[in-house]
Design a protein with these regions (language model features):
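Glycine-rich Rossmann-fold phosphate-binding loop(s) that bind the pyrophosphate
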Residues: 162-163
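Rossmann-fold NAD(P) dinucleotide-binding segment
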Residues: 221-222, 233-251
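Short glycine-/small-residue-rich Rossmann-like dinucleotide-binding loops
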Residues: 230-234, 257-258, 277
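Short helix-loop-beta connector
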Residues: 149-156, 179-180, 248
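Adenosine-phosphate binding glycine-rich loop
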Residues: 2, 13-21, 259-260, 264-375
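NAD(P)-binding Rossmann-fold cofactor-contacting core
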Residues: 176-203
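N-terminal ligand-binding/catalytic initiation module
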Residues: 1-137, 141-143, 153, 346-349, ...
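Short, conserved loop/helix-junction motifs that constitute active-site signature segments
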Residues: 177-178, 242-249, 264-268
Length: 377
């Protein structure tokens, strides 16, 4: 960049696809590098503690002003700023609005954009469509867990919630565990189940058996890997509960959505892993105990159990610590591992940066001029 002139690159969703945003293996490699950096501490997110998930705008159940949105499932706006160091050394922010009624209009529940910025000047580098950045990095963080924590000969994958995220998760897991040959699906709507099956048959032919399950129990029993990616429950609605007798020895649970386990099982019978323990500590500060009632991600139950004195802090293992050789991963083929995935804006900045760099190198996207010379400075 030749100052004072500032140009930025606009990347549409089509541009992002051309630049490789849907490459599940590269995205997983990127997220693995990111998790190592998180464990080392070479990053910042929002808030005084530098670990905030973001700033959320929510709405009242009964708005008193005409035109103000009304509270509902996944009804929010959110800004998610971050800086990530290492080879990335970029700042950025993902911004999105979410409304489940969008699907009736043929558009996604959440519509996301991201801005990447130069870490020194703050100058904008790129404004990009971020739905695919977010979807693929959301699948890739569990993917890192599968790569390092799942049994090597895993054959049966169970998914709960066959929406966009779990559909991409299936593709990611299939690339990382070619031994997978059976897919079990538990969903609520036939349309999403049908879309998922159509995608899998086209993109993941290694699955020779596809089973649609009527119950959560049916999906979990005999599954080597289980992924949960469901919509946020309504306030006061109980989270789906996994019973210990359903769980196969050696199973890996990837949990980026609302799910619950029996306290005793978490305390005594499973290895508990999180994507970044500091994220859950930040949530515990922002939403005091019982945090799990507000934040439906399972790692918040881990911190609640610690708050109650039922679980030691040492019982919660950071995946980045495993990747950096500071902690032990899977210890046997019978060990059950429960992996909580919270989702962080550093992930968007990291994967968005790699896609942006490729786009710049290959002439993809539209250059926009901010100014040749600033009017005020």
């Amino acid at each position: 960049m030749s100052y004072p002139n500032i140009d930025l690159l606009y990347l549409s969703e089509e541009d992002m696809i051309k630049a490789g945003v849907t490459d599940v293996v590269k995205c997983t490699d990127c997220m693995e590098e990111l998790l190592k950096l998180l464990n080392k501490g070479d990053y910042r997110m929002g808030g005084e503690n530098g670990n905030s998930h973001g700033c959320m705008v929510m709405f009242p159940d009964e708005p008193e002003f005409e035109g103000m949105p009304k509270n509902g499932p996944d009804r929010r706006f959110m800004a998610m700023p971050a800086y990530i160091g290492g080879k990335f050394k970029r700042a950025g922010m993902k911004w999105y609005g979410s409304n489940v009624e969008n699907r009736e209009k043929g558009i996604p529940r959440s519509i996301l954009m991201m801005m990447l910025n130069d870490k020194d000047t703050g100058a904008p580098l790129s404004l990009m469509s971020a739905n695919l950045v977010s979807a693929y990095r959301t699948a890739a963080i569990p993917g890192v867990g599968v790569k390092h924590l799942a049994v090597k000969d895993a054959k049966v994958l169970g998914i709960v919630g066959p929406g966009v995220i779990n559909t991409i998760t299936i593709q990611t897991f299939a690339a990382l565990r070619p031994s997978l040959d059976t897919l079990k699906i538990k969903g609520r709507g036939q349309a999403s189940i049908d879309r998922c099956i159509e995608f899998v048959k086209k993109e993941c032919p290694q699955f020779k058996n596809i089973i649609v399950c009527d119950t959560l129990e049916e999906c979990i029993r005999d599954s080597d890997i289980i992924s949960f990616a469901t919509s946020t429950p309504k306030p006061g609605q109980p989270y789906p509960l996994v019973k210990s007798e359903w769980i196969k020895k050696g199973a890996l649970f990837c949990c980026p959505a609302a799910i619950d386990f029996e306290d005793e099982y978490l305390i005594k019978d499973a290895k508990l892993v999180v994507d970044n323990i500091k994220l859950y500590e930040a949530w515990a500060e922002e939403y005091p105990y019982p945090t799990f009632k507000t934040i439906c991600i399972l790692g918040s139950k881990f911190t609640d159990l610690h708050h109650e004195g039922k679980l030691s802090k040492e019982a919660i293992t950071d995946l980045g610590a495993i990747l950096n050789g500071k902690a032990v991963g899977r210890t046997s083929d019978d060990e059950v591992i429960i992996y909580s995935v919270g989702g962080m804006p550093v992930e968007d900045v990291a994967w968005g940066s790699e896609v942006y760099d490729y786009a710049m190198e290959h002439g993809i996207g539209t250059k926009l001029n901010l100014w040749e010379k600033p009017y005020l400075y």
